[in-house]
């Protein structure tokens, strides 16, 4: 009886992580982006890095780079905002690229007081709003089942290899039950070390 239960448990555990186990792996962000094929943008492209700290990253080599962070900065291209509570401080359809490196795992899935809110869903709505049509969102985040997903006590939003494809893509759109209003195509996803790299393209 105990052996049968053991194997049933193994089967359930494998089912929950098999999607991540079967994903492509790359050694670096550069290798991942190269595998995504040509990413077209205009000469005067703009990129926004969310949760950028003091140094926004620019993997798409956009001509203009902006950053948003919860901490104030003397750099004029870094704007202070708490994206768990505030909108992205840029106009609609203004960015060719939005990136988030080790950031979305810090954005709560649900807040109950004073009213029920879904900050992660709200952030994805904001990303969709600020991106230009066919713009790209690149996420780099610790992924389940790696311990990096949980070790940091400020990681409150564990991401799996299926989070984006089930809740935010233009097929299943499960996020709509929580207020997601946008739509993304999943261009590519892969594992790099203990992290999931996801490239999404805005769809209207």
Regions found by a protein language model. Give the residues of each.
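A short glycine-rich, Lys/Arg-flanked "PGG" loop and its adjoining helix->strand segment in the class I
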Residues: 117-133
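Short, flexible/disordered intra-domain loops and linkers
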Residues: 109-120, 148-156
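Conserved beta-strand signature within the Rossmann-like core of class I S-adenosyl-L-methionine
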Residues: 134-141
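Conserved N-terminal segment of class I S-adenosyl-L-methionine
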Residues: 1-93, 97
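Short "lid" loop at the C-terminus of a central beta-strand within the Rossmann-like core
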Residues: 142-147
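A short beta-strand submotif of the Rossmann-like class I SAM-dependent methyltransferase core
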Residues: 97-103, 109
């Amino acid at each position: 009886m105990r052996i049968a239960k053991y194997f049933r448990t193994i089967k359930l555990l494998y089912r929950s992580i098999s999607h991540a186990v079967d994903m492509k792996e790359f050694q670096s962000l550069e290798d991942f982006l190269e595998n995504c094929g040509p990413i077209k943008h205009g000469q005067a492209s703009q990129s926004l890095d969310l949760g950028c700290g003091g140094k926004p990253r620019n993997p798409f080599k956009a001509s203009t780079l902006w950053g948003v962070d919860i901490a104030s900065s003397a750099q004029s291209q870094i704007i202070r905002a708490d994206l768990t509570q505030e909108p992205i401080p840029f106009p609609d359809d203004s960015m060719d690229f939005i990136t988030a490196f080790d950031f979305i795992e810090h954005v709560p899935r649900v807040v109950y007081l004073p009213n029920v809110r879904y900050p992660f869903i709200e952030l994805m709505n904001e990303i969709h709003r600020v991106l230009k049509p066919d713009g790209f969102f690149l996420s780099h985040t610790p992924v389940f089942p790696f311990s990096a997903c949980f070790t940091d006590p400020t990681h409150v939003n564990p991401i799996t290899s299926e989070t984006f494809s089930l809740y935010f893509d233009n097929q299943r759109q499960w996020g709509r039950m929580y207020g997601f209003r946008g739509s993304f195509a999943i261009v590519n996803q892969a594992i790099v070390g203990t992290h999931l790299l996801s490239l999404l393209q805005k769809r209207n």
